[in-house]
């Protein structure tokens, strides 16, 4: 996944590798030229001093220029790769079913698309700017240091063993900690998101302190975990520096006796110290970058987990079809993910094209669940749902969206314009089509009063509209494509009785050939339906006209009489 994204920018990556090679060559050659300059100083060979000095300065400038170019290349690659991964992750999430979303939860997915992608961007920047350079520079410096002073090989070996041990301990300690840190980050993001969405409820019941306490608990856990990681790295980095500088002291202590015995070794010793300094530099950088690299690796795994997830529902790749509006449930049993108890149990019924069907029942009876099976937001565990005699699992996603439209109880609007929101129902909806949909939904009145009409702005979550206005726009979005089956999931609950009646009259007049499924809390909303389905604890316990059910169905009659009594 990560390397596949890198391949799209292979020429930038290869250019970065070339610059890295020049930087490494510059770093490895500088101590070698320094050795020869010192030898020339001892021999008082001015010609060699000038020529080698010129090479030294030239190579230094090449390394500096290569470093500057490489920073630009690394920044471009990191931003491009992270942008591609963010888009790929978002595109993948768009294919997820409700079950997939519930598996991760929305807050978790938001963190993965933001924080985790940022971590990947950082580690990509590190990779091309520093990480690719470190191992080659380390190996090259080790080899040249040993070649320069073979008798001091044991100092290099001891240094490598100690650093390898420290790195192994660090990775073993930090891996689980970073994973827990990301989990807590997901959790605190979910709490914040939930609180902001439900801010009216929080303030209505004066629960600010409770919400703060809940947030504070997770925040304290997150702080504790972050502090542990910080403390660990604050110990590991100085330890690596201590090991590195101890090796320099050990080398100087050993070399001091050698210089007294053989003064001509000064140039070799200076070169050796130069290479040893580069070895220590790579060690310190490993300690310094370990935090970011470990986080980046975990973030790559988390993004890979999303991209590797197969959608819970697959749609056949077939041409879009026009279907008649008949609907049938055949022995349908359904339970939500992670729920043991079925929400719907052995449901069977048939609907003829153009009929109006009401669905009633107590809260939790399964009305909305039944509605969500019709546009195939979920698949039943048993039985089948058919439209036009065709099993939903045989239909392409385009066919379903073309023929079936659902208007949910909770009116969800997207930031943009009114036209943008209506075109969620039909991508290329014309102005006359939107005006017709608005008339049906009784939204024309307030839209026409707005200065920019259908081009008027919709703020985030439709916060600049009332509940009734949002619900009417949601209904308009549902009818704009003139569907063969329209599902209204208690979608007139925010409307007054007059507006609700006008919407129903407009639906009957304008969508005469459309099969309409109305999920209702109030029986008055479906009293004129061709057929009413009565649900109770997930079972279909009755179906018929209003008059038939009042006469024969105890549950329906009880609901009707209770509501009638309240109205009286």
Question: Where would I find each of the regions flagged by the language model?
Answer:
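Short intracellular "coupling" helices and adjacent cytoplasmic loop segments at the cytosolic face
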Residues: 43, 79, 87-111, 115-117, ...
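Hydrophobic alpha-helical transmembrane segments of ABC transporter permease domains
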Residues: 7, 18, 26, 30, ...
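ABC-type nucleotide-binding domain
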Residues: 323-568
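A short amphipathic helical element positioned immediately N-terminal to and/or at the very start
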Residues: 1-8, 109
């Amino acid at each position: 996944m990560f390397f596949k994204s890198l391949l799209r920018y292979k020429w930038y990556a290869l250019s970065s590798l070339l610059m890295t090679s020049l930087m490494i060559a510059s770093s490895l050659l500088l101590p070698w030229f320094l050795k020869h300059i010192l030898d020339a100083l001892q021999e008082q060979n001015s010609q060699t001093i000038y020529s080698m000095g010129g090479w030294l300065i030239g190579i230094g400038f090449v390394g500096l220029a290569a470093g500057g170019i490489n920073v630009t290349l690394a920044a471009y690659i990191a931003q491009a790769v992270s942008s591609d991964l963010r888009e790929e992750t978002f595109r993948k999430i768009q294919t997820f079913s409700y079950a997939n979303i519930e598996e991760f939860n929305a807050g978790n997915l938001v963190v993965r698309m933001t924080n985790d992608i940022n971590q990947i961007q950082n580690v990509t920047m590190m990779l091309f700017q520093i990480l690719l350079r470190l191992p080659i520079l380390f190996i090259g410096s080790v080899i040249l240091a040993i070649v320069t002073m073979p008798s001091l090989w044991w100092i290099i070996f001891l240094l490598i063993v100690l650093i390898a041990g420290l790195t192994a301990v660090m990775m073993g300690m930090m891996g689980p900690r970073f994973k827990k840190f990301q989990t807590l980050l997901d959790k605190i993001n979910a709490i914040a998101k939930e609180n902001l969405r439900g801010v009216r409820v929080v303030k209505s019941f004066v629960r600010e302190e409770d919400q703060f306490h809940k947030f504070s608990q997770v925040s304290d856990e997150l702080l504790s975990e972050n502090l542990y990681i910080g403390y660990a790295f604050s110990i590991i980095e100085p330890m690596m520096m201590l090991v590195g500088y101890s090796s320099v002291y050990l080398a100087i202590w050993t070399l001091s006796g050698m210089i007294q015995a053989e003064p001509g070794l000064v140039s070799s010793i200076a070169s050796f110290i130069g290479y040893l300094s580069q070895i220590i530099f790579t060690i310190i950088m490993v300690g310094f970058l370990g935090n970011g690299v470990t986080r980046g690796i975990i973030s790559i795994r988390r993004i890979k987990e999303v991209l590797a997830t197969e959608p819970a529902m697959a749609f056949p790749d077939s041409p879009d079809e026009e279907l008649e509006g008949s609907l049938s449930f055949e022995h349908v049993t359904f339970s939500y993910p992670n729920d043991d108890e079925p929400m719907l149990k052995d449901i069977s019924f048939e609907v003829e094209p153009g009929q109006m069907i009401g669905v009633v029942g107590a809260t939790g009876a399964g009305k909305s669940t039944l509605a969500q099976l019709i546009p195939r937001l979920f698949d039943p565990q048993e039985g089948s749902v058919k439209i036009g005699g065709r099993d939903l699992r045989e239909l392409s996603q385009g066919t379903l969206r073309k023929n079936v439209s659902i208007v949910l109880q909770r009116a969800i609007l997207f930031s943009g314009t009114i036209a943008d929101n209506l075109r969620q129902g039909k991508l290329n909806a014309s102005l006359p089509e939107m005006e017709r949909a608005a008339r049906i939904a009784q939204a024309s009145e307030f839209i026409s009063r707005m200065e920019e009409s259908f081009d008027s702005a919709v703020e985030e979550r439709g916060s600049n509209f009332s509940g009734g206005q949002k619900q009417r726009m949601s209904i308009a979005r549902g009818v704009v494509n003139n569907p063969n089956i329209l599902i209204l999931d208690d979608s007139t609950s925010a409307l007054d009785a007059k507006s609700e009646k006008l919407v129903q009259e407009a639906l009957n007049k304008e969508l005469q050939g459309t099969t309409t499924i109305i999920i209702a809390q109030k029986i008055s909303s479906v009293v004129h339906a061709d057929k009413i389905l009565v649900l109770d604890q997930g079972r279909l316990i009755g179906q018929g006209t209003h008059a038939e059910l009042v006469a024969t169905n105890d549950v329906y009659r009880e609901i009707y009489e209770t509501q009638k009594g309240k109205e009286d």
